């Protein structure tokens, strides 16, 4: 096979709608270019800098066909590795290289990886409201659209300090009463189960805001509600507690969206302490490491549910789609409606149909990127207050 020489590497940091997105474009001497998702919405310009200033000169003139070797070169080039900024930058290039290979082969990515493991992948979406009646309306809408898996959240991750017993002159920010949250959420599960029966299966995301003993209590109390999974019940630096949780609760546990380093998942997978791996593909370095992680999980009976939030580009969403169609142990695909401006920048964004994502049949990843349209949406700094929730006494919660 003749070499496919990399002639340019570009990173684009944009904010077409609510979230900052980062996309990488790799160009070659064969006139074929590829796209990759490098979105780390909290540090978009840092990722762009790594791509433009460090990876670009490293990659120019190299053979785009040699994806494994190029991934290894990028991973060790800075010596220190496995951090979110570098991993996302590497991911953008890695996905783009797979996109190029698929186009050169005239094959969709899932076919390039080995073909279908299923006809379509079930999807789940998010029903979020401040009260039960509004939440029911959200659920009814999603049921009408064909969803049979719905993540249910009552309120967001925080609260109003004026409604909590806080010290005088509380620190400004988002507040979160862990005991009240557990009580309110369990009552929500019961109300939804009574109203809807088995019309759909609930999921729920704790977003790492409980202490270990609270997490065990909550998972045990959630057992009667037959959740598809309970997500991120602990922060990753407390995941050793999952061994105790697993021994005391049958509630399926999913975690992984904060993972960057293989050391964060190796023991969890080897010891079968989780049911679902929720890694974010760009956060772990792209398609190349995602395939290795998925196969490791498959050998240990752990299913895949890639993190697919609203702060992911349609390129990243499409990659998850391809992986989920191909991987034997893929279980479900998260999805949130893609806003209008984002759709104007990215062509071919995958959309669920009656609760499923079907294979993308275009060659490569199958997404287009309008650079002129993207230029209309420059990146904007956001403080992301929701990552800085506090307990009523003002203590910062570590997500």
UniProtKB/Swiss-Prot annotation:
Disulphide bond pairs: none
Superkingdom as given in the UniProt entry: Bacteria
Matches recorded under InterPro entries: DgoD-like, Enolase-like_C_sf, Enolase-like_N, Enolase_C-like, Mandel_Rmase/mucon_lact_enz_CS, Mandelate_racemase_C, Mandelate_racemase_N_dom
Protein residues bound to Mg(2+): 205, 231, 257
GO terms for biological process, alphabetical: amino acid catabolic process
Keyword annotations of the record: Magnesium, Metal-binding
Single Gene Ontology MF annotation: magnesium ion binding
Binding site for D-arabinonate: 207, 257, 278, 307, 334
Keyword Metal-binding: yes
SMART domains given in the database record: MR_MLE
Family: Belongs to the mandelate racemase/muconate lactonizing enzyme family. GalD subfamily.
Function: Has no detectable activity with D-mannonate and with a panel of 70 other acid sugars (in vitro), in spite of the conservation of the residues that are expected to be important for catalytic activity and cofactor binding. May have evolved a divergent function.
Protein name from the UniProt record: D-galactonate dehydratase family member ECAG_02205
Originating species: Enterococcus casseliflavus (strain EC10)
């Amino acid at each position: 096979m003749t070499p496919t020489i990399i002639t340019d590497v570009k990173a684009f940091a944009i904010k077409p709608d609510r979230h900052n997105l980062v996309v990488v474009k790799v160009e070659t001497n064969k006139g074929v270019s590829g796209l990759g998702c490098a979105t780390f919405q909290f540090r978009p310009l840092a990722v762009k800098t790594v791509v433009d200033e460090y990876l670009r000169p490293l990659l120019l003139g190299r053979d785009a066909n040699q994806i494994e070797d190029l991934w290894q070169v990028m991973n060790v080039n800075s010596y220190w590795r496995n951090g979110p900024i570098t991993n996302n930058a590497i991911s953008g290039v890695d996905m783009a290289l797979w996109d190029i290979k698929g186009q050169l082969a005239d094959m969709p990515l899932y076919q390039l990886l080995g073909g279908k493991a299923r006809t379509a992948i079930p999807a789940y979406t998010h029903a979020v409201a401040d009260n039960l009646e509004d939440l029911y309306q959200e659920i009814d809408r999603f049921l009408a659209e064909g969803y049979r898996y719905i993540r249910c959240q009552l309120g967001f991750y925080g609260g109003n300090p004026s409604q909590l017993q806080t010290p005088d002159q509380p620190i400004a920010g988002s507040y979160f009463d862990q005991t009240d949250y557990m009580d309110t959420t369990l009552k929500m599960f019961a109300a939804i189960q009574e109203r809807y029966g088995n019309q759909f299966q609930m999921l729920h995301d704790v977003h790492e805001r409980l202490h270990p003993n609270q997490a065990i209590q909550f998972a045990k109390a959630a057992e009667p509600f037959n959740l598809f999974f309970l997500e991120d019940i602990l922060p990753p630096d407390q995941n050793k507690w999952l061994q105790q949780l697993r021994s005391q609760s049958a509630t399926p546990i999913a975690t992984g969206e904060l993972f960057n380093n293989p050391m964060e998942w190796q023991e969890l997978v080897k010891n079968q302490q989780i049911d679902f791996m929720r890694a974010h593909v760009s956060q772990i370095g792209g398609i190349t490491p995602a395939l290795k992680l998925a196969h490791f999980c498959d050998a240990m009976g752990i299913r895949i549910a890639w993190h697919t939030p609203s702060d992911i580009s349609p390129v990243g969403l499409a990659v998850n789609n391809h992986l989920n169609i191909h991987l034997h142990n893929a279980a479900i695909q998260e999805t949130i409606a893609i806003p209008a401006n984002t759709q104007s920048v990215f062509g071919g964004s995958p959309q669920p149909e009656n609760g499923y994502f079907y294979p993308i049949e275009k060659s490569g990843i199958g997404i287009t990127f309008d650079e002129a349209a993207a230029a209309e949406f420059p990146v904007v700094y956001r403080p992301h207050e929701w990552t800085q929730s506090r307990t009523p006494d003002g203590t910062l919660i570590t997500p």
